[in-house]
UniProtKB/Swiss-Prot annotation:
Residues 1-22 form the signal peptide. Expressed by the venom gland. One of its GO terms (cellular component) is extracellular region. Has the structural arrangement of an alpha-helix connected to antiparallel beta-sheets by disulfide bonds (CS-alpha/beta). Residues 25-80 form the LCN-type CS-alpha/beta domain. Belongs to the long (3 C-C) scorpion toxin superfamily. Sodium/Potassium channel inhibitor family. It is found in: Secreted. It comes from Androctonus crassicauda (Arabian fat-tailed scorpion). This is Toxin Acra I-3. It comes from the Eukaryota.
Amino acid sequence: MMKLVLLSVIVILFSLIGSIHGANVPGNYPLDSSGNKYPCTVLGDNQSCIDVCKKHGVKYGYCYGFKCWCEYLKDKNVSL
């Protein structure tokens, strides 16, 4: 029983460390030529969002809240 509790605590700590590490990555939602955010349907890693982000000048993006999010996208590069 004690081993199970210890294992659970370790798993929770590693989960928290992972979420804290990823939370500090700046970015932005890119906008199309009409000023709309790009929609996406597959949350997380998403090739269409990566392609959109590359058009906006950054290397990586993903689907978050059913909209494409680009890591390190600066305000000046949000619109095409």
